[in-house]
Amino acid sequence: MGMTIAEKMLAAHSGHDTVVPGQLIECATDWVLCHEITTPAALRMLEERGMDRVFDPQKIVAVPDHSVPAMNIKAAKMYQKLKSWVQEKGIEHFYDVGRGGIAHVVLENTGLMKPGQTLVSGDSHTCNAGALGAFATGVGSTDLAGAIYAGKVWFKVPETMLIRVTGKTNPGVTPKDIVLEVIKQIGADGANYMVMEWVGDYIDQLDMEGRFTLTNMAIEAGGKTGIVAVDDTTRAYMQQRGVSPEQYTEYQSDPDAKYKVVVEIDAAQVEPTVAYPHIPSNGRVAGSDRIRVTHAYVGSCTNGRITDLRDVARILKGRKVAQDVQMIVVPATQAIWKQAAQEGLLEIFVDAGASVSYPSCGACLGMHSGVLGPDDICISSSNRNFVGRMGDPSAQIYLASPATVAASAVEGFIADPRRYDAEGNDLNAAD
């Protein structure tokens, strides 16, 4: 029987010729990604057991991103713990405040993580890196401790869901809308402990930024990870980061690979989608209800990339954020922040009345720099809209594409971005 991409990677990293879903394996990890929130707990476990070592300091990437710059003393102590450990263990791949940004987006841009490799991190959106044709997944602090100490993790080989997206999207429809549509169709647990493998001619023509958005949200359907097979787009992306095809292994699913579920999506039928509170699967067409918003947030590891910021600038240029809306734009990394500045995007945001913040996860999980208060209503380009996710439990979070967030910020209500053409012109201006 043939194997899927994920099964081939797990077999190669566990010393097996083949693996099957449900099989328990001990899997070698090529990389361990650490941030300041979950890593200290893992380090305490190791210290308490006299196992305070690192399996390979060259295979650990550390990026403080959730609570930085520190907003209180507790956050400062977590940051200090991570940084002192990095210095003590000689971990070179450390992207400090002012040099990094959101860990998942930092990692995807470094060229360190390569196709065919494995990655674990104490963060559920580690699946982001699956767009590189890699196996990347989040783990708890106990497994994170094991990975730091031994470079290995126990896995149950997951089943795979094949998601075939064909055709072309209509103007105003983005990869975020595609993934929200998929989650709407299969449910928030529809891919529970499965690999979500993305294929189809829509995927073939999609840039890497869009692919990262798709794999990033695998966990929002319960997925173990998301994966896109390596192709010319992947190879070009790696080449731009100084990595040649000789430096990594490509895996493709066999023609007779077995899939648990096959989902078919016609891209032309997908509309701008908004996930209503309080679950990402609660998708509806953008603008179908007149819902006032008090906050608009663009950022996160899902949609804080330069292409996302360009979509936002296209709509905000020459316009103002509605008077009663607080809009925050967070470039995902320092490099993206700098590029956005060079392209004049930040000036557009500021002129429109948006606040441009430093790269961090702060607002996304209600930790700092954009926490929602009682009864606030936020439209967000992030990945989760659970009760209390971004602040007060009474606040409501609507998930959408950056373009939909921008259109909604301007109009003060959840809006359909299709009323703005490719140049940002309002097609309904004459109404």
Curated annotation (Swiss-Prot):
Cofactor section: [4Fe-4S] cluster
Keyword presence, Transferase: no
Domain of life: Bacteria
EC class name: lyase
GO molecular function, one term: metal ion binding
SUPFAM superfamilies (alphabetical): Aconitase iron-sulfur domain
GO biological process, one term: L-leucine biosynthetic process
Keywords noted in UniProt: 4Fe-4S, Amino-acid biosynthesis, Branched-chain amino acid biosynthesis, Iron, Iron-sulfur, Leucine biosynthesis, Lyase, Metal-binding
Alphabetical list of Pfam families matching this protein: Aconitase
The keyword Amino-acid biosynthesis is assigned to this record: yes
Cofactor binding description: Binds 1 [4Fe-4S] cluster per subunit.
E.C. no: 4.2.1.33
Record-listed [4Fe-4S] cluster binding positions: C301, C361, C364
Catalysed conversion reaction: (2R,3S)-3-isopropylmalate = (2S)-2-isopropylmalate
InterPro entries reported for this sequence: Acnase/IPM_dHydase_lsu_aba_1/3, Acoase/IPM_deHydtase_lsu_aba, Aconitase_4Fe-4S_BS, Aconitase_4Fe-4S_dom, HAcnase/IPMdehydase_lsu_prok, Homoacnase/IPMdehydase_lsu, IPM_dehydratase_rel_enz, IPMI_cat
Biological pathway: Amino-acid biosynthesis; L-leucine biosynthesis; L-leucine from 3-methyl-2-oxobutanoate: step 2/4
Binding partners and assembly: Heterodimer of LeuC and LeuD.
Family note: Belongs to the aconitase/IPM isomerase family. LeuC type 2 subfamily.
Function: Catalyzes the isomerization between 2-isopropylmalate and 3-isopropylmalate, via the formation of 2-isopropylmaleate.
Name of the protein in its database record: 3-isopropylmalate dehydratase large subunit 2
Organism from which the protein derives: Deinococcus radiodurans (strain ATCC 13939 / DSM 20539 / JCM 16871 / CCUG 27074 / LMG 4051 / NBRC 15346 / NCIMB 9279 / VKM B-1422 / R1)
Name of the gene encoding the protein in the UniProt record: leuC2
